[in-house]
Amino acid sequence: MATQSVEDSSRSGPRRTNVGSLLKPLNSEYGKVAPGWGTTPLMGVAMALFAIFLSIILEIYNSSVLLDGILMN
């Protein structure tokens, strides 16, 4: 016979590993959403600070090598 059937008793379940045991609590929180705004204001502050950082970097970049001979007000 070309195909061979495997008995259900010979199949093993999922293996348990140390890493899996450590990560299981994180996976059990999947799909749960904290009520209210949560950490949204903190994320807004972080985004604002990052935007300021990017604008400072852009200012430094624009006034450096590329525009050496150009006077800007």
UniProtKB/Swiss-Prot annotation:
Annotated region Disordered: where? Answer: 1-22
Instruction: Please tell me one Gene Ontology term that the record gives under cellular component.
Output: chloroplast thylakoid membrane
Q: What post-translational modification does the entry describe?
A: Phosphorylation is a light-dependent reaction catalyzed by a membrane-bound kinase; phosphorylation occurs on Thr residue(s) in the N-terminus of the protein.
Q: Name one Pfam family in it.
A: PsbH
Give the record's GO biological process terms: photosynthesis; protein stabilization
Note whether Nucleus occurs among the keywords: no
Please give the Gene Ontology molecular function terms for this protein. phosphate ion binding
Describe its membrane topology: Single-pass membrane protein
Keywords (alphabetical) are:
Chloroplast, Membrane, Phosphoprotein, Photosynthesis, Photosystem II, Plastid, Thylakoid, Transmembrane, Transmembrane helix
Q: Where in the cell is it found?
A: Plastid, Chloroplast thylakoid membrane
Q: Which protein family is named in the record?
A: Belongs to the PsbH family.
Which PANTHER family does the record associate with it? PHOTOSYSTEM II REACTION CENTER PROTEIN H
Assembly, in brief, is:
PSII is composed of 1 copy each of membrane proteins PsbA, PsbB, PsbC, PsbD, PsbE, PsbF, PsbH, PsbI, PsbJ, PsbK, PsbL, PsbM, PsbT, PsbX, PsbY, PsbZ, Psb30/Ycf12, at least 3 peripheral proteins of the oxygen-evolving complex and a large number of cofactors. It forms dimeric complexes.
Designated name of the protein: Photosystem II reaction center protein H
Q: Which organism is it from?
A: Pelargonium hortorum
**Its encoding gene is what?**
psbH
